[in-house]
Amino acid sequence: MRIVIIGAVAAGTSAAAKARRNDDFAEIVIYERDKDISYSGCGLPYYIGGDIEDINELTPRDVKFFKDKYDIEVKIQHEVISVDPDKKVLIIKNLLTDEVFEDHYEKLVLATGASPFIPKIEGIDKKHVFFLRNVENARDIKSFIEENKPTKAVIAGTGFIGFEVLESLANYSIDVTIVEVADKITPNLDIDMANFLENTLVKKGVKILKSTSINKILDKEIILSNENTIDADRKSTRLNSSHGIIW
């Protein structure tokens, strides 16, 4: 039995380990387009904030671990670019060498997780705009903070990871503005809990803008859908961060 798994974060590596426990003789291969595997997404903001000092703590199980413990081959920085379910054939690209090759499977597991929603906003490709989806994103954000010493940040969206980022930015004494398109923060919470959370954040100095969205990102300001602006006190002092699903 040849089992191929696409994705090597939480679901993919868990599926691979379970498959090995069920079958001692199966050939198991995981393809992952990033270079980090089996990491804790919930821990990413706490690396940014310094609560987790060593980023390797987020990735305790590497390629060698899965090979030695489970005899599972993990191919990092390999992207599956097409699947032919009739022929059970995959087309894979090695992102390091640009080599494209075929592989086959008997059983296929899709464990690719979520992808960041990137809205069509002018300026979203600027260097001080970030998404938080994986370990590499966390590295980039932390490096930006340490190198540029920003004093202000904008968080677009009020998902749970965004709030963890908010807490982490407080460790750097960064003033934070939250922009939420809905008429209340944390749309999944009941109104009483959302109001309680909002009041608590406001008391702690967080500025919250509801029922609005970001229309344009410039070097020194953000233009909102209601035509108001969010100013920065110097160039590159905004860190725009989202958790990759909710913008």
Predicted regions and their residues:
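Glycine/Thr-rich phosphate-binding loops of Rossmann-like dinucleotide-binding domains
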Residues: 118-119, 163-164, 247
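Beta1-alpha1 glycine-rich phosphate/pyrophosphate-binding loop at the start
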Residues: 1-73, 77, 166-189
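FAD-binding core/adjacent interface of flavoenzyme oxidoreductases
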Residues: 1-4, 64-156, 211, 222-238
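Rossmann-like dinucleotide-binding cores of NAD(P)H-dependent redox enzymes
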Residues: 59, 152-153, 160-215
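Short, glycine/charged-enriched secondary-structure capping and boundary segments
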Residues: 19-21, 43-46, 89-90, 122-126, ...
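Single conserved hydrophobic/aromatic residue that forms the stacking wall/gate
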Residues: 235, 239-247
